[in-house]
A protein has these predicted regions:
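Extracytoplasmic mature domains of secreted or surface-exposed proteins
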Residues: 1-153
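Extracellular beta-sheet-rich ligand-binding/adhesion modules
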Residues: 152-228
Length: 228
């Protein structure tokens, strides 16, 4: 029987293509709709577990065209979205794939442009992202209908003398908000340092990054240390 405690009101004004559950019970919904229960929400919305609108998920003007076909929530709470859209998301140009923060704001650290529909997104056990659809190109690289992407799917910050999300691992992005000395060989996805912050890699130690160092701070590689 239909669960009458799921309070969606008038529901959606057009097709729902995807429903994705978050670990906290909230519900991400993507499709071709422009409204949910009388509230303007273009192509994507997040609901509370009881079906009511989650107003903390702020998408602004949403998608200007196309549809949302697939949604994946990363371990760090960021959300990958794919579909047929090729206009803008809240005023910023996007083509078939983007990533938003847990609050719905566009994540400018991620960029992927596809020349055709993105139909499905999945994550492997080693945190690589596999995408499939009707595309032949991913950000200028020829890939026919399927591709695998490398990206950082988790983050830990060094602040107030501690890591905010556990010690560094190969799948995590490191963000330093205070001076720090890396005294043991450390593997990470990438590394960013805040302005005015200095991070030292001690002699005999390696900082091994999947991607790169970035940020406005200073990374010091001592004699006998290495970065790769």
């Amino acid at each position: 029987s239909v669960d009458s405690s799921f309070l969606v009101g008038t529901g959606f004004d057009a097709i729902v293509y995807n429903v994705t559950l978050q670990s906290d019970g909230k519900i991400l919904v993507g499709g071709s709709f422009a409204n949910f229960n009388g509230n303007a929400r273009r192509r994507i919305v997040r609901l509370q577990p009881d079906g009511t609108l989650d107003t903390s998920f702020v998408i602004g003007t949403g998608f200007s065209n196309g549809t949302v076909r697939t949604i994946l929530v990363q371990p760090n709470g960021k959300i990958l979205i794919g579909g047929t859209f090729s206009g803008t998301y809240n005023g910023v140009g996007v083509k078939r794939m983007l990533r938003v923060q847990a609050n719905g704001a566009l994540d400018g650290s991620f960029s992927a442009n596809l020349n055709g529909t993105l139909s499905t997104i999945a994550m492997t056990s080693d945190e690589k992202v596999v995408i499939g659809g009707a595309f032949n190109s991913v950000s200028g690289t020829t890939k026919h209908r399927i591709a695998r992407l490398l990206l950082c799917v988790d983050q830990t910050k060094r602040v107030a003398g501690a890591w905010t999300n556990g010690a560094p691992t190969a799948g995590k992005e490191l963000f330093f908000e205070e001076d720090y000395t890396i005294a043991n060989t450390t593997y990470a996805c990438n590394c960013a340092i805040a302005s005015g912050v200095e991070v030292n890699v001690s002699a005999g130690t390696t900082l091994a990054l999947r991607y790169q160092y970035e940020g406005a701070g200073l990374l010091v590689i001592e004699d006998g240390a290495s970065l790769h």
